[in-house]
């Protein structure tokens, strides 16, 4: 039963991942996410339903458009598989792990699972938009803040309303202070305004500790990823989007934050 639930979660997640690909591609361009139907960006070929099956269609089409044979970006199946894996991980970590007897519904853990899925979904979309466009959309940041506050009003959210509000303030003010000092000292932005809003959104879901976790883990991951580029191009400056790293840091804290807190305070 557990394997079946995880498999269903993966399939459902990959379907949402296909939708996320539409959001990632169209929203920064100001295009409608409803119309027109998905088309090949090279030749305009209208993608048929059987050519739009998450992950599998990419494999069957061998990564090429069926009409013009131009390559389809590997990013599409990556987003679909990543989202499927994330959905399955959330279902296991926040529900199955606490409720191995799946015949009994636990409302508290269902709410936590839904919150984790929605939170991560926002981060996935924002991360890939940031990678492509070096921007983080206000609609997701502000919408995420509202969503985090709404979950905190329930007795089953990750944090209570007080912690959520403190997380928003802390996630917005501390990074802004870092941004301001860096701008004054280096005469350049070390942190984007979109990153600050993203951290406020992270704080709405997970409070102050999740903001700190996102900043710490995000900085470490970002540094490790950036080192090869820095070593190869010592005299050149590159802008590396920080949103994906903050998102990874927040996800790590969401899954392992309680363990880390116990280690730190015992």
Where are the regions that the model predicts?
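Transmembrane alpha-helix boundary signature
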Residues: 90-105, 155-164, 258-262
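C-terminal ends of transmembrane helices
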Residues: 21-27, 62-70, 123-135, 177-188, ...
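Hydrophobic alpha-helical transmembrane segments
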Residues: 1-15, 87, 149-156, 249-266
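Long, charge-rich boundary regions
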Residues: 61, 66-143, 147
């Amino acid at each position: 039963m557990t394997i079946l639930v995880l498999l269903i979660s993966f399939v459902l997640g990959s379907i949402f991942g296909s939708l996320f690909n539409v959001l990632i591609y169209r929203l920064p361009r100001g295009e409608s996410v409803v119309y027109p139907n998905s088309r090949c960006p090279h030749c305009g070929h209208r993608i048929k339903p059987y050519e739009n099956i998450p992950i599998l269609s990419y494999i069957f089409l061998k990564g090429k458009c069926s009409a013009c044979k131009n390559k389809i970006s590997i990013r599409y199946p990556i987003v679909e598989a990543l989202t499927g894996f994330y959905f399955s991980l959330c279902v296991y970590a926040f529900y199955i792990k606490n409720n191995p007897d799946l015949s009994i519904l636990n409302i508290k853990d269902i709410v936590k699972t839904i919150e984790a899925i929605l939170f991560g979904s926002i981060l996935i979309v924002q991360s890939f938009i940031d990678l492509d466009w070096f921007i983080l959309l206000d609609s997701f940041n502000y919408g995420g803040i509202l969503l985090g506050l709404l979950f905190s009003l329930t007795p089953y959210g990750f944090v209570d309303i007080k912690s959520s509000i403190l997380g928003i303030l802390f996630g917005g003010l501390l990074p802004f202070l870092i941004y301001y000092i860096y701008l004054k000292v280096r005469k350049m932005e070390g942190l984007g305004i979109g990153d600050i809003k993203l951290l406020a959104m992270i704080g709405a879901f997970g409070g102050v500790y999740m903001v700190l976790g996102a900043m710490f883990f995000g900085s470490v991951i970002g540094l490790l990823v950036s080192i090869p580029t820095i070593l190869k191009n010592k005299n050149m400056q590159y802008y590396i989007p920080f949103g994906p790293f903050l998102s990874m840091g927040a996800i790590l804290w969401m899954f392992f934050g309680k363990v880390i807190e116990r280690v730190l305070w015992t």
